[in-house]
């Protein structure tokens, strides 16, 4: 986790990029599981919004269309200087990659020491506040501020369903 910080990126961007490139390639080899597909199939019958801390893009690859990625996506890049952002579609010739403006590109993920993107966070609060049912899957609910989203749902009278092998 030492490399998952803004400080590590500016200290050694090449090392951080090598680590993320390895993770990205591994993630691209992984297929969505039955749970991902079940959630995407629910969209055919109900209004489903996915609020996820995962950065792997598996929800979208399973067919889900309304996904709020609180911690960003390892499949996207953004510039450290300008507003450029895009999906990663090919391997980079050298690391760290450079933007057309000359700035360094970085993985579009939230690192330790950074805040969540405010537009995504505000959308997540809104969705949690108006949902009828919130299904919480595979999280310990210890990472703040995402762990407050069930509180917003419960304050609105939503039913909370937790699916987790460990007690939280």
Pin down the residues of each PLM region.
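Conserved catalytic core of sirtuin-type NAD+-dependent deacylases
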Residues: 1-168
């Amino acid at each position: 986790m030492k490399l998952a910080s803004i400080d590590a990126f500016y200290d050694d961007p090449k090392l951080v990029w090598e680590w993320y490139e390895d993770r990205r390639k591994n993630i691209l080899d992984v297929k969505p599981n039955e749970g991902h597909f079940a959630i995407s199939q629910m969209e055919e019958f109900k209004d489903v919004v996915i609020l996820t801390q995962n950065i792997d893009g598996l929800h979208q690859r399973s067919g889900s269309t309304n996904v709020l990625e609180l911690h960003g996506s390892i499949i996207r890049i953004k510039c450290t200087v300008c507003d450029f952002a895009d999906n990663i579609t090919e391997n980079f010739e050298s690391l760290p990659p450079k933007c057309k403006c000359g700035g360094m590109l970085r993985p579009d993920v939230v690192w330790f020491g950074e805040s969540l993107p405010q537009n995504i966070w505000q959308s997540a609060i809104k969705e949690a506040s108006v949902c009828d049912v919130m299904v919480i899957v595979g999280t310990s609910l210890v990472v703040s501020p995402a762990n407050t989203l069930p509180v917003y749902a419960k304050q609105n009278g939503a039913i909370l369903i937790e699916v987790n092998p460990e007690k939280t």
